[in-house]
């Protein structure tokens, strides 16, 4: 092998080395672009999943709030119904007492005048009973027992 052959071999190996380096650069660039594209797609997908999760959470919270308000409304209606029933029973009892008092006052010629006031858990009664020249005034506040 002469000096010319050595230069040709050296040039040839240098060309092969440059070509290998260039192909390696192209492959690395292609892999980098593919990795970046995969990373972009993964970021987008994570955002989509996060939005779906936030939407699900909001729907669950709205459903929970709706259930709670329905329970509160139902409890309120039941409490109102119980109080109304109690009020109606007391009003009926007051009317019965009034009928008997009026009958009694009519038959004994006693004049009875008064009024009552029914508040949340109290019955305020004011009565004035007159029998001839004698008069009696009664004012009383009766606490009513409440069953919860």
Swiss-Prot record:
Residue ranges annotated for the IQ domain, each copy included: 11-40, 67-96
Pfam families with a match to the protein in the record: IQ (PF00612)
Protein name per the record: IQ domain-containing protein F5
Annotated keywords: Repeat
Gene3D superfamilies linked to this entry: 1.20.5.190
InterPro entries noted in UniProt: IQ_motif_EF-hand-BS (IPR000048), IQCF (IPR039887)
Originating gene: IQCF5
PANTHER family in alphabetical order: IQ DOMAIN-CONTAINING PROTEIN F5, IQ MOTIF CONTAINING F
């Amino acid at each position: 092998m002469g000096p010319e052959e050595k230069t040709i071999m050296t040039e040839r190996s240098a060309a092969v080395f440059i070509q290998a380096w260039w192909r390696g650069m192209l492959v690395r660039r292609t892999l980098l672009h593919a990795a970046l594209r995969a990373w972009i797609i993964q970021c987008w997908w994570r955002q989509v999943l996060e939005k779906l999760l936030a939407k699900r959470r909001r729907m669950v919270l709205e459903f929970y709030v709706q259930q709670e308000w329905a329970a509160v409304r139902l409890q309120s209606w039941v409490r109102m119904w119980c109080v109304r029933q109690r009020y109606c029973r007391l009003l009926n009892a007051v009317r019965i007492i009034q009928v008997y008092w009026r009958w009694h006052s009519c038959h004994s010629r006693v004049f009875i005048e008064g009024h009552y006031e029914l508040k949340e858990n109290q019955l305020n009664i004011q009565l004035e009973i007159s029998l001839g020249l004698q008069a009696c005034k009664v004012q009383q506040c009766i606490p009513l027992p409440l069953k919860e």
